[in-house]
Amino acid sequence: MNPNQKIITIGSICMVVGIISLILQIGNIVSIWISHSIQTGNQNHTGTCDQSIITYKNSTWVNQTYVNISNTNVVAGKDTTSVILAGNSSLCPIRGWAIYSKDNGVRIGSKGDVFVIREPFISCSHLECKTFFLTQGALLNDKHSNGTVKDRSPYRALMSCPVGEAPSPYNSRFESVAWSASACHDGMGWLTIGISGPDDGAVAVLKYNGIITETIKSWRKEILRTQESECVCVNGSCFTIMTDGPSGGPASYKIFKIEKGKVTKSIELDAPNSHYEECSCYPDTSKVMCVCRDNWHGSNRPWVSFDQNLDYQMGYICSGVFGDNPRPKDGKGSCGPVNVDGADGVKGFSYRYGNGGWIGRTKSNSSRKGFEMIWDPNGWTDPDSNFLVKQDIVAMTDWSGYSGSFVQHPELTGLDCMRPCFWVELIRGRPKENTIWTSGSSISFCGVNSDTVDWSWPDDAELPLNIDK
């Protein structure tokens, strides 16, 4: 083959290779375009699954439930139409209490990122229930958890997370800077109340759907404080009780009526011989019933009931089955404060049914240990100590703490009555245990008209944690 033939042959081969390469590149471009078109077409579509609509979108949703599967957000669509929670139903008839949630926060926090918290509570809208809690601006098993036995600090905040989940930075939502708080839903939006500031000049910041709408300044300049449980909404108005003044003597107590985050009316209770703190409130046939803590001189619990005009009645639970802690042994009750072991106290609750009531209380008379529910059919009005039902919730040997009421509205449950529920705080750490921190987990129960069981659902985390050693 002469040189010219070699050149022609090599050139022909190069041309063929170039043409093949060009064809491959064109095919690759077409393939990429087709693949992109398919992905784009599938990015936003709906499909029917058991008559429920499942929507897949690469976008952020509000008021939806997310289920995380293989890092893909599957959004289960549901009716988010606003309604006004009427609050005009009576309490559901019940035979006992069924376990609703348990978050095991301290146990999980020994290894995972879980907030140091206290004062957890639950509140429900017509769509969902949420756990609210006061953080200490710190995580369990971390150096910043040191000294969190302190109640009031600028690091505390009201946050929320799904019921039954351990409160962590990954599932929690900031609500308000607060060392005392309340929250509730009127069917259209969340009202949050967060109190923060110095003891002699604290301010309550009211938010409606996350926007500041009102502030309330301490009027007695002596630790303004509120419920540490849910406020109550009836027919578009929400109600809360605040206390300002001594914790061991007569103080000032005010009821506030709030609409869309704005205070529309308030009154001060005329209660010179009573003490109302950390009230647990619930709606019942368009009225509001609150059962509170007497930290001054009562080992039974004070109550106040009021209508939407803030006309009120008040008294003490008469039963000789005493609900506070510390308290004397059960005996003869009183429709006024029972002074024996009446100083100090713990947040608690009861539900009234006619002349009777369900009384929630610690099992121990002198320490925050154990928890039980007692049905006293005449306890609201009769001072004897007879009761018919006792249901064990936490054993005497295990720590408990604050407790409070919350309800599930008919708009959520589909029932024709208001379902009564309660939560119990399970405090761990200081001052009773050898740790540098104070925190807790929580459990909750709802009333049912069917079979229930006695058992113990304790926190049961093994202490001390690594940070304490």
Swiss-Prot record:
Signal sequence segment: none
Catalyses which reaction(s): Hydrolysis of alpha-(2->3)-, alpha-(2->6)-, alpha-(2->8)- glycosidic linkages of terminal sialic acid residues in oligosaccharides, glycoproteins, glycolipids, colominic acid and synthetic substrates
UniProt-annotated binding residues for Ca(2+): 294, 298, 324
Membrane topology: Single-pass type II membrane protein
Cofactor(s) this protein cannot do without: Ca(2+)
Gene3D superfamilies for the chain: 2.120.10.10
Virion surface side: 28-469
Record localization: Virion membrane; Host apical cell membrane
Transmembrane region(s): 7-27
UniProt note on regulation of activity: Inhibited by the neuraminidase inhibitors zanamivir (Relenza) and oseltamivir (Tamiflu). These drugs interfere with the release of progeny virus from infected cells and are effective against all influenza strains. Resistance to neuraminidase inhibitors is quite rare.
Post-translational modification: N-glycosylated.
Binding positions (substrate): 118, 152, 277-278, 293, 368
Note: The influenza A genome consist of 8 RNA segments. Genetic variation of hemagglutinin and/or neuraminidase genes results in the emergence of new influenza strains. The mechanism of variation can be the result of point mutations or the result of genetic reassortment between segments of two different strains.
Protein name per its UniProtKB record: Neuraminidase
Organism: Influenza A virus (strain A/Fort Monmouth/1/1947 H1N1)
